[in-house]
């Protein structure tokens, strides 16, 4: 967790240098910003000290939160989430085959919670072990791990697999988009872009909510994604995910709430807003 924090602050320092803060502005920022973060009731501090000449928001809810903190509404623009523009282009016209195979192939996306200091390593590993041990009670599942390509140690999870004598594949650097073509259902407990991508691509997904510090965000709609709240029910939840009939209007409303527009034009909107302000 400390390494992650230091890396984030180094990035912040480089950013502050790039935008030409003078020494007094630099001191003021670094005295106030950590304090604001520490006492914020949000996971990201919404404070006037963060206001810029232009603030780009992914969703309307972000804009509303900032406006409540006194941000200038004229300087706050909603443009969507540019990181998904490339996904939109890659998946346009692609249909994913969600038909059941003889053995249900599960891609279990793990790791990241203790690395970011949100859980202890013991808590995260216990959840993983309990889940895998429950799944392997039945022979109808083929399970593989997918870990974060950067922030998670491959050696750590190889060791976990070896210690528990599991026969599992483990992926790290591989493209998630390519992997999910080979799997029937995605299983995870991590609050990450994986969840959003599954919703966008209409890929069956089950979110684990069996820990009292669950990572699942309240805005996830169970009419769109399946949630497992008890490992004894995980088989039913996996089956439900594969057979879920999703209302397109409900799905589109959830996408709008989570990431804004999914149209491949978020980067263009961001660039236009930046150009307008520097003219």
For each feature predicted by the language model, list its residue ranges:
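Conserved N-terminal ligand/cofactor-binding loop architecture of enzyme catalytic domains
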Residues: 1-35
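A nucleotide-sugar donor-handling region in carbohydrate enzymes
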Residues: 25-28, 32-120, 246-252
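Structural motif
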Residues: 54, 105, 142, 184-185
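Short, aromatic/basic amphipathic alpha-helical patches
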Residues: 68-70, 155-165, 217-221
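Conserved catalytic-core segment of nucleotide-activated headgroup transferases in glycan assembly
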Residues: 83-160, 169
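Donor nucleotide-activated moiety binding/catalytic core segment of transferases
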Residues: 149-195, 200, 211
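Catalytic binding pocket for nucleotide-activated donors in carbohydrate/polymer assembly enzymes
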Residues: 161-162, 190-262
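C-terminal alpha-helical cap of glycosyltransferases
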Residues: 262-279
């Amino acid at each position: 967790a400390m390494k992650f924090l230091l890396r984030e602050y180094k990035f912040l320092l480089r950013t502050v240098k790039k935008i030409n803060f003078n020494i007094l502005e630099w001191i003021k920022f670094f005295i106030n910003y950590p304090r604001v973060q520490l006492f914020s009731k949000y996971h990201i501090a919404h404070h006037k000290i963060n206001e810029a000449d232009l603030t780009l928001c992914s969703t309307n809810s972000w804009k509303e939160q900032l406006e409540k903190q006194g941000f200038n509404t004229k300087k706050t623009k909603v443009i969507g989430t540019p990181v998904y523009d490339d996904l939109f282009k890659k998946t346009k016209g692609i249909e994913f085959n969600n038909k059941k195979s003889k053995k249900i192939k599960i891609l279990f996306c793990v790791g990241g919670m203790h690395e970011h200091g949100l859980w202890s390593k013991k808590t995260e590993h216990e959840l993983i072990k309990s889940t895998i041990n429950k799944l392997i009670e039945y022979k109808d599942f083929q399970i593989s791990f997918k870990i974060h390509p950067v922030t998670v140690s491959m050696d750590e999870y190889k060791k976990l697999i070896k210690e528990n004598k599991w026969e599992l594949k483990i992926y790290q650097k591989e493209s998630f988009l390519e992997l999910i073509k080979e799997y029937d259902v995605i299983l995870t407990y991590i609050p990450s872009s994986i969840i959003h991508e599954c919703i966008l691509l209409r890929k069956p997904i089950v979110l684990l909510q069996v820990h009292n510090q669950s990572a699942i965000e309240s805005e996830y709609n169970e009419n769109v994604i399946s949630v497992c709240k008890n490992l004894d029910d995980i088989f039913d939840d996996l089956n439900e995910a594969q057979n879920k009939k999703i209302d397109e209007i409900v799905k589109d409303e959830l996408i709008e709430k989570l990431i804004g527009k999914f149209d491949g034009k978020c980067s263009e909107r961001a660039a236009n807003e930046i150009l307008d302000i520097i003219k």
